A protein has these predicted regions:
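Non-catalytic cap/lid and distal C-terminal segments of serine-dependent acyl enzymes
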Residues: 1-130
Length: 130
């Protein structure tokens, strides 16, 4: 859950981080309650919906304002996380928060990530040169 963790930390600590990026990240963990042993940390989803709601990136967006973070979201068109990334993109658009949203052919695998890293580096190179 690296992409979720990166965004989670950056949004919660925007006073420390100026930018955040995710490639194939699970931006909303709620559709996947039986995966990655998350219920060990958050409890059973059906019994702890509020806890899950409070621990998913897409709901942290409400605490962001445009300009708080430079954000890049990148996800393959065949990735099982595509829908939650698209949902995050739409939430950011609704809040008028500038961000880069990239989708290309590819899945949740090393081949996609090896290609994606070039876009992430370009994004952060530009960010750090400001």
């Amino acid at each position: 859950m690296g992409g979720h963790g990166a965004m989670w930390n950056a949004i919660r600590h925007k006073d420390i981080f100026g930018g955040a990026g995710t490639t194939s990240g699970g931006m909303d963990i709620r559709p996947f309650p039986k995966n990655w042993e998350m219920s060990k940390q958050l409890g059973d989803y059906d019994s702890n919906k509020e806890v899950w709601d409070n621990h998913t990136v897409i709901n942290l967006i409400d605490g962001l304002e445009n300009g708080d973070l430079a954000i890049i979201i990148d996800c393959g068109e065949s990735d099982f996380f595509l829908k939650v990334n698209q949902n995050l993109h739409h939430r950011l658009l609704e809040k008028k928060i500038d961000h880069d949203f990239v989708t290309r052919p590819g899945a949740h695998n090393g081949q996609y990530w090896n290609n994606s890293i070039d876009y992430q580096i370009l994004f952060f190179d530009k960010f750090f040169k400001k």
